[in-house]
């Protein structure tokens, strides 16, 4: 609030940004396990945020026009902001949507349950281990966490048994999974709503509107539907 008040009524600075200029360098383990710096562009970051916004609008339509998060959305930030999930999907999307962020110093399932309760948070994003530990801790304490509406995951495949447990402990919440690359500003695929419930092992569909995905054989030719590839 102090930051907003300090700039209230002041004109925005006149600056020109090259859309293809560097935005950030994020490090990715890639295929070899050795960290490699991926240079992200301004255009790539903005495209990702707009793509997530389009995805959110599509999810709202699929839900009959009802907004899952209500008038006071809030997210538990338990992932680092130097990673695409924390930077793009959590931080920048929160700025765009006016969503409250509550940051954790380090991950602890008990603290997470307490913060969701105290801050009335609606959203939690993290790796599958985090969402599972949160679910088990809430179950142990007999907590439903009524305000929690979304349990998103990425970074690894969430076991199907985890999805069933989330449905059991948090019947009011919906779970989802996303896949992306650091080099693509986290854009990739998304699996949510009824698709996720029917096929939780799937990586989902390409995120609109600029994502194209194809699977190729070892010789680089396109693989057929149902054929293993990369």
Residues covered by each model-derived region:
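Conserved AMP-binding/adenylation subdomain of ANL enzymes
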Residues: 46-74, 82-122, 137
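Conserved beta-loop-beta connector loops within the AMP-binding
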Residues: 214-230
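Conserved pre-ATP/AMP-binding loop-to-beta segment of ANL
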Residues: 8-27, 34, 64-74
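Short beta-strand->loop structural element characteristic of the AMP-binding/adenylate-forming
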Residues: 36-39, 77, 99-106, 176
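Conserved AMP-binding A3 loop
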Residues: 23-51
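Conserved S/T- and glycine-rich ATP-binding loop of Class I adenylate-forming
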Residues: 22, 28-31, 75, 81, ...
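Gly/Ser/Thr-rich phosphate-binding loop
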Residues: 96, 118-126, 135-198, 208-212, ...
